[in-house]
Amino acid sequence: MAVLLIIIAQPYFFLMTITGTHFNYYHICHRKLWLFSNGINMEQESDLVYEGTLLHEYAYPQRNSKYEEVVIDGIKVDYYDSKNKIIHEIKKSNKIDKAHEWQLKYYLYVFEKHGISGVKGLLEYPLLRKTSEVILTDADREKIKYISDDIETIISLQSCPPLVQKGICKKCSYYEFCYTNESDI
C-alpha cells in the first residue's frame, strides 16, 4: 500500500520570528527590512557595522561578566541586568534614535510577554556620552501589535519595496546594493 505524502511548503518568512532588528529596520527603511528578511544580508561587509560591533565589545568591558545575555523568542539582548531589571542597548549614533527606541520597546514587550515584568530599557550612546531611559506604555503595546502586522505584510511582499532616497542611505550597509542597479530587483 502506497502512502501519498503531501508537503505544503511555505516561504520561510511565514516561519520567521520578528526580532528587534525587524523593528529597527521598519523605522529606518522598508526596503532594508524586506531585503534583510528575505535573506539578503549586507551587514557582514559593512565597515560601519564592524565599528558598531567593536564599540559594543569595548565601550563597557566590565559588563561581559556583570550582566547576562538573554535570548527569548528570537531576540538577543546582549546586556540584561537581572538584579535591577534593565536592558542595556548600546548604539553608535543617535541619528536614528526612533528606530533604536522601538527596537528596545520591542525587547521590553517580549520580556513582558514571557512573564518578566517591570523591566526598563536604557539606550546608551557611549561616543556621545548620552543615555536615555525607555519604558513601555499601553499605547506602545498597541502600536507594537500594529507594527508587527505591518512588518509581516512588508516581508511577505513578492518583490522588494521601491527605493526611497533618504539622508541616511549613504551610511547604510545596503547602499551599494540599492544604488548599483535598482531596476534588477
What are these regions (language model features)?
Residues 36-42, 111-118, 180-184:
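Short helix-capping/linker segments at secondary-structure and domain boundaries
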